[in-house]
């Protein structure tokens, strides 16, 4: 690493990412596992996206949001895993500060859109189950696009706030990050300037973002649960609970790992637990989402099968 001179002393030009494991003998195993996870995640999500685009019977609001979620999952894992695999191959751990902040921005952009999209999906289920007579008008294509556009706009603002807050900090050594990608807790820990204001800002933004999202999702599903319990058909009740259960599972995993990550802001000592949470955020979540949401869904399964075999739906 070549430090460069700044107005406030020596300012580091790059960070050293230690990765998941420091044992050289285990690096090939890590490479194969993460390459496999990456290919499975990208392949699964792109298959769902293609099915949603091609199959007429999947041209509904629920699958429109699932298609967008698939794009986000591919983006989220592509921000972190390919660069980690590249470092494993080249055995170079140095990452320029600019590249680190860029990774931070895009990671929080995709995760932020995911967060807001989960609200839209909960709202969609609320309308479909609790307001079925007005569902088609309240969840029109225009409304769907507006919800997705609003999700991107809010997430962009959130990611930009995080990135600007980190860019104002001074990093003058040490520059070793015990992680496999750049994220907030690790950068805050390495800063040689006061991080109190930045941490308060990030806590406030994170609390508003996560708190509002969770409150809206919980309120939606309280109404959904009450409506489902009033359904007389056992089959209809089972189908509704299956769809909502998949969404709630993803919500629990997503917010659970995200809240833990934010709670690590201000921590003076970061451990391997943070790497485990990082794996959940960047690899496990994007890989599980297609399985939880769609591969359990017979409509999606049959749509993907028809697409792979060259048969088209007549719907």
From Swiss-Prot:
Task: Indicate where this protein resides in the cell.
Answer: Cell membrane
Glyco sites are at 8
Q: Does the keyword Hydrolase apply?
A: no
- Which region is the signal sequence? none
**Which residues point to the Extracellular side?**
1-28, 83-103, 162-199, 265-275
**Could you name the domain of life of the organism this protein comes from?**
Eukaryota
Q: Does the keyword RNA-binding apply?
A: no
The entry's family comment says:
Belongs to the G-protein coupled receptor 1 family.
Q: What is this protein called?
A: Olfactory receptor 3A1
Q: Which organism is it from?
A: Gorilla gorilla gorilla (Western lowland gorilla)
Q: Gene symbol?
A: OR3A1
